[in-house]
Regions:
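Eukaryotic short linear interaction motifs
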Residues: 13-15, 85-86, 136-137
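Active-site-proximal specificity loops/subdomain of glycosyltransferases
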Residues: 55, 62, 72, 79-126, ...
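The conserved acidic donor/metal-binding loop of glycosyltransferases
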Residues: 131-135
Length: 143
């Protein structure tokens, strides 16, 4: 099954703001949440899995990639304004795409994200709009 997740993401600190996406002291928490919602969800739900194994006592620990029939073909898209985001700190992944939108009004970015999903829905079996701090724990969520 091919699944497309799309999420809006804005981090633009402003003094005395009540919103976490506008609070500098929340930067680390927001960065960790974005990492879990992107790379974490990709690692948890794709057909690509990683094993971490020791080569023996006092030997190296290695990481190996495995492909399984479990999971889905998952792509995650982050829809974000340039200069007002934390996406530059995410590791590269072939199934993670960052789209730097030209939308100036940050409150309209969720609408742009939804539009992107609708414009690309024919290429996927399932599409989903997700916030930038949501982790999908259930391994059967997409089944």
């Amino acid at each position: 099954m091919k699944v497309l997740l799309a999420m809006p993401h804005v981090f633009s600190p402003k003094e005395n703001s009540l919103y976490s996406s506008q609070t500098e002291s929340k930067r680390q928490q927001k960065q960790q949440a974005l990492l879990r919602a992107t790379i974490g969800n990709l690692n948890r739900h794709q057909q690509r899995h990683w094993i971490h194994a020791s080569l023996g006592k006092n030997k190296d620990v290695v990481n190996r990639e495995l492909q399984t029939s479990d999971g889905v073909s998952l792509k995650t898209v982050v829809f974000t304004p340039p200069g007002a985001n934390l996406s530059g700190e995410l590791p590269e992944d072939k199934n993670l795409k960052i789209i730097h939108t030209k939308i100036k009004d940050f409150q309209q970015i969720p609408l742009g994200t939804s539009r992107y999903l609708l414009e690309n829905c024919d290429d996927y079996d399932m599409i989903a709009y997700i916030e930038d701090d949501i982790v999908i724990q259930d391994p059967y969520f997409f089944t």
